[in-house]
UniProtKB/Swiss-Prot annotation:
Catalyzes the transfer of a ribosyl phosphate group from 5-phosphoribose 1-diphosphate to orotate, leading to the formation of orotidine monophosphate (OMP). HAMAP family: PyrE. Its EC number is 2.4.2.10. Pathway: Pyrimidine metabolism; UMP biosynthesis via de novo pathway; UMP from orotate: step 1/2. Gene3D superfamilies: 3.40.50.2020. This is Orotate phosphoribosyltransferase.
Length: 212
């Protein structure tokens, strides 16, 4: 487990941005039963946590994508973190809506993006990647050259891996579901039986918790 992955996992559990409830699961809008609920918007209210996030993402971009010219935040939860990362890297910032505005100029992208500029897109959470990939299409249509998509946390689902591979876009996250449940067990947030159930969910989220 990398130091930053463990730090972010601990942060998310401590501020209750992530709740684990394998014995009393949540129901997603899609109808899927889930033992985890994530609200990374809470991170903006904790200066130390948001600094860990901004510095962690900035370090990855400097190391892996040094040619990056623009940071793009995905509306709305990705915007504040993208702004802090852009500030650390002294790079331009844009943000991208899931769809164009239905009034005014009808823009989907706010800020200045020049054709050919190299972009790293940032969001708070990756489940299957559907919303951020829609935003990525808008950036590409505007001439942006997307280097990667980054996030604070990923559920590390096979569906996301497949979707990003199909889009030919690299994906990185500071922490992920396997790392988080490992940290949760070490800190006694969950017991061994709950850990086993949490592992099972990630292997087959659509059928986990479904009884005949």
């Amino acid at each position: 487990m990398s130091e930053i992955a463990a730090t972010i996992a601990t942060d998310l559990l401590t501020i209750k941005a992530v709740t684990l409830r394998p014995n009393d699961p949540f129901t997603w809008a899609s109808g899927i039963k889930s033992p985890i609920y994530t609200d990374n918007r809470l991170t903006i209210s904790y200066p130390a946590v948001r600094q860990h996030i901004a510095h962690g993402i900035a370090a990855i971009i400097k190391r892996e994508y040094p040619a990056t010219e623009v940071i793009a935040g995905v509306a709305t939860a990705g915007i504040p973190h993208a702004a802090w990362v852009a500030e650390l890297l002294n790079l331009p910032l844009i943000y991208v809506r899931a769809k164009p505005k239905d009034h005014g100029a009808g823009r989907q992208i706010e800020g200045v993006l020049k054709p050919g500029q190299k972009v790293v897109m940032l969001d708070d959470l990756i489940s299957t990647g559907g919303s951020v990939l829609q935003a990525a299409k808008a950036v590409q249509a505007a001439g942006g050259d997307i280097q990667a998509v980054g996030a604070i946390f990923s559920y590390a689902l096979d569906a996301a891996t497949q979707n990003f591979a199909a889009a030919s876009l690299p994906l990185f996250s500071l922490s992920n579901y396997p790392e988080l449940i490992k940290v949760a067990r070490q800190a006694d947030y969950i017991d061994d039986e709950e850990l086993a159930s949490l592992h099972t969910w990630r292997q087959d989220p659509e059928h986990w918790g479904v009884t005949d």
